[in-house]
């Protein structure tokens, strides 16, 4: 484990932006980020917390392209975002799933610094 943050009030992309530094960026597989089905249903109805819009206003400067609003969703008890060496990712994912965290997923990779800190794929 090289870094970790809880995904709470600043949403996934807000907290990911806290992990940026002057040497790395992230490629994020947006479709791999676990989303609670009911959150998707509410977002599709336009029911989105005000904090999510504020998070987008802040963090979008770090993000290439248009991100799903749920990636900015303000959480009160979100998941954990963990960074592990790429060579250990599959093993870490297996251990998390074996421990009962079945929604765990590899959601991206760290890369050399690019124009945007967070590049959505």
Which role does the model predict for each range below?
Residues 1-121:
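Glycine-/charge-enriched secondary-structure boundary and capping motifs
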């Amino acid at each position: 484990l090289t870094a970790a943050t809880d995904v709470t009030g600043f949403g996934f992309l807000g907290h990911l932006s806290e992990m940026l530094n002057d040497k790395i960026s992230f490629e994020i597989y947006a479709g791999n980020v676990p989303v609670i089905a009911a959150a998707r249903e509410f977002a599709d109805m336009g029911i989105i917390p005000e904090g999510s819009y504020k998070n987008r206003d802040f963090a979008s400067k770090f993000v290439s392209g248009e991100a799903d609003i749920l990636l900015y969703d303000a959480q009160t008890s979100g998941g954990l975002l963990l960074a592990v060496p790429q060579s250990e990712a599959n093993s870490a994912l297996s251990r998390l799933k074996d421990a009962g965290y079945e929604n765990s997923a590899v959601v991206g990779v760290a890369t050399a610094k690019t124009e945007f800190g967070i590049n959505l794929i």
